[in-house]
């Protein structure tokens, strides 16, 4: 009798345990189906969008006080490796000052032109047909990235007796971060009065970087001999305001050529390229 009772007790314990294990296996199978299959089919991974560069520079050229040329950089974003449950309809790159969309049946590359310096926060979006996501939107938000756009200003004046002040508005045009530094390179050339002979005089000049209080933040005097050049190279870190770069010299001296190059640079906080 004792042996029989023991056998019944063991069977009683095994049956609930078997039921528990069976339930666990069923739940596990359901979770595998939900987490495995759907994720593979439905999610478009951010790294599937390829971009070789996330920083570029606007170049603005001035001659005798007027803008003559501006070159805006173009960055490309390739959605070729992206995947979704159904066919893509379009690809979009969108930000504060940019909004470019292409037909997915024609190309996978979105080219974006940047006309404002600073940090652009961009959304990379793909639209695919008849498969609303959990938000009830046919658009699948792929990723959000940051692009750094800097600016270079090239300034030239020829044969001038009254150099024009170069106004530098270095305040950031997009994003929350001001430029990290202004890099200035200025050259004054004193052309020979008679080519290959000379006969002119040396020129005394003064470079000044003037802030919005009309005070000189920095200055540099220089002497430019006949037929030669002199330069002033400096950096300035108070960037989120307007300055004037001035070259002055005494009246009655020989006409001079003036050239400035100013780079408005930002800290490298952009997203790392994927290609």
Give residue ranges: language-model regions.
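Acidic, Ser/Thr/Pro-rich low-complexity intrinsically disordered segments
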Residues: 161-225
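Acidic, Ser/Thr
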Residues: 72-86
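C-terminal edge strands of extracellular/lumenal beta-sandwich accessory domains
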Residues: 130, 199-213, 236-275
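Residue-level recognition of secondary-structure-to-loop junctions
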Residues: 110-116
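Short beta-strand segments within Ig-like beta-sandwich modules, predominantly Fibronectin type-III
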Residues: 98-107
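Non-catalytic extracellular/lumenal accessory regions of secreted precursors
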Residues: 131-172, 217, 265-275
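Secretory targeting signatures
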Residues: 1-51, 120, 124-126
